[in-house]
Amino acid sequence: PYPIVEKSPSGKPALIVTTSGEAKFLGHLEVSFNKEGIPTSWNGEPVRLGKAGGSSEITKIINQAAEPVIKRNSTVVGTNLVKMRDGLDPCREGDCLSAMVTTDAMLDYARPKGAVVALINGGNFRAALPVGKITQGDIDNLLPFKDKVLLRKYTGKQLFEAVEHGVSDVDGIGPRMIQASGLRYTYSPTAPVGHRVRSVEVQDKNGKWKPLEYNKVYVAAVGAFLASGGDDHKALAGGIQISNSGLLVADVLKAYLKKKSPISQTPQPRISTVKEPSGE
């Protein structure tokens, strides 16, 4: 139904409308009110934009306003030669190229400041890193949120809890999944929630992987969303903040691409799964 009609706490009708997402529909609703401002009648339905006629005047205004945006978005910031699974869904399911390169960029930025790992949630990523030229517009599509890079201290226990929480959705996949650089982990998607992670390792300064130590303190570059407890990541909200760079994750990625392009080596796996014994 359009609109959905509910009752307000006072018993008056409340009209609720939605047009889904991705600008597919334009809402259209005509409402009549009485003297008390209470809706008395209504009529309308969402209009599919593909069928809506355009306005030449509005199109002209949009085109004029779009010129500087198009120029900015077409600016090339780097090049990628790697083809691998990537995009919104892959970044919520396991390793994905955009998250691997982004966390590498975060760690590259923060390592001189003492960081040994970089963490961000898979839900941050909304597009794939294109193969070929990478533009500013691609970066905006990839990381549309204004997440910032923070430097924080965490115990190994807190990092383990974050990884565990990251795979607590159905089948271990979802936006809360931890994407990382300098850290890798293995989990069982069929194990009980809270008991899925089988191992977590951290890479030392010589490139060797060592088991995460619960009582050791690690410095991490982490997205502000996670550090604020986003996606219910309580463990990451509990860290001790060292600094707030003020830099957007997207800007750190852009600087990294300018420095490291072309991206030509497929990153080593960081998220692995194991099957539970059948018990037969």
Q: What annotation goes with each model-predicted range?
A:
Residues I4-L15, F25-H28, K35-W42, C96, ...:
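Feature captures C-terminal
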Residues N63-G78:
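Acidic, glycine-rich low-complexity/disordered segments
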Residues I16-S20:
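Short beta-strand elements at the ligand-binding edges of bilobed clamshell
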Residues G21, S32-E36, N43-L49:
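Surface-exposed loop and adjacent secondary-structure segments within mature catalytic domains
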Residues T40-I61:
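Short, exposed interaction patches on small structured surface elements
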